[in-house]
């Protein structure tokens, strides 16, 4: 089975903004065709191939459904894979802002200030949404994979910061 990218599997143009309803419809349409239950009485080989396709489709669907995974897939497709462990392309200014925010979260937790925690959480979520819009523009309008990758790393950083609220 030749390696296919998630966009090819669903017949979608490789771009960041996707129609979620169209993706869902395609997923169920394709899944019906290759679901292993349809091949229960088939040969072992056919059953194994159906299982492989079902797994491939599920993995592709998960990648395309999650904006970070979709962005990482686009970066890889465009020759700019993202190393999650590296913050090298994130600006020092952004990192300093996040350090200050992390301290504010810690202070609010220590003092039991739930109102301040909620304000901080909403600010992170808003910044994340704005960055995802910037990622979409970088990929789909500007075709600037480096900018998209930098913004995507920022989103990943903010996601980790949101874990501080759990």
Regions found by a protein language model. Give the residues of each.
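C-terminal accessory/regulatory regions appended to core domains
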Residues: 1-166
